[in-house]
């Protein structure tokens, strides 16, 4: 009986403190009955690399360390678009502008979840020739670091777009 109480006294608080949080469902907004499948090429506006770290630990010798992760959102977006058959271009050529999308990325919010927070990103696809929006998608992610949050949010937003 004492053993059961001991196990429950450890298990219940740990479940309460580390419970799963549900992420908001990704949101997709289409404009003028357009589809990104009508396009062949994409140009991603450059983004800066983001580095974040978590977890500091020590041992009996006083050695400390942590985990550092980095992400460049435009690389993650490009990889997903490559998997879906799109071709990345380094510049927009007037002859191909009608078949080219401009892809913009932005962090659009944070939400407190349990003992941490999640990050929401918004990805905008624009017609390169008319400068009109094709589709805008948003997704939310939560991971160990801010880099993980952004990576998961991008994946969730674009995963829904390509279903």
Language model features with spans:
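Sec-dependent bacterial lipoprotein signal peptides
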Residues: 1-22
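Short, surface-exposed loop and linker segments with low hydrophobicity and enrichment for Pro/Ser/Thr
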Residues: 5, 31-39, 91-98
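Residues embedded in well-ordered secondary-structure elements
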Residues: 9, 33, 112-114
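A structural "domain/chain start" motif
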Residues: 18-84
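Surface-exposed short loop/turn segments
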Residues: 26-28, 61-71, 75-148, 152-155
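C-terminal alpha-helix
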Residues: 156-163
């Amino acid at each position: 009986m004492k053993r059961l109480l001991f196990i429950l006294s450890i298990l219940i608080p740990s479940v309460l403190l580390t419970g799963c949080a549900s992420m908001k469902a990704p949101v997709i907004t289409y404009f003028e009955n357009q589809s990104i499948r009508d396009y062949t090429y994409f140009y991603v506006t450059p983004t800066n690399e983001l580095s974040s770290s978590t977890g500091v630990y020590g041992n009996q010798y006083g050695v400390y360390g942590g985990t550092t992760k980095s992400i460049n959102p435009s690389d993650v977006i490009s990889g997903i678009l490559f998997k879906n058959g799109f071709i990345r271009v380094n510049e927009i050529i007037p002859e191909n502008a009608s078949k080219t999308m401009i892809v913009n990325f932005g962090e659009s919010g944070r939400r407190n979840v349990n003992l941490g927070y999640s990050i929401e990103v918004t990805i905008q696809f624009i017609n390169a020739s008319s400068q009109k929006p094709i589709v805008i998608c948003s997704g939310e992610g939560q991971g160990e670091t801010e880099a993980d949050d952004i990576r998961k949010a991008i994946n969730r937003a674009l995963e829904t777009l390509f279903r």
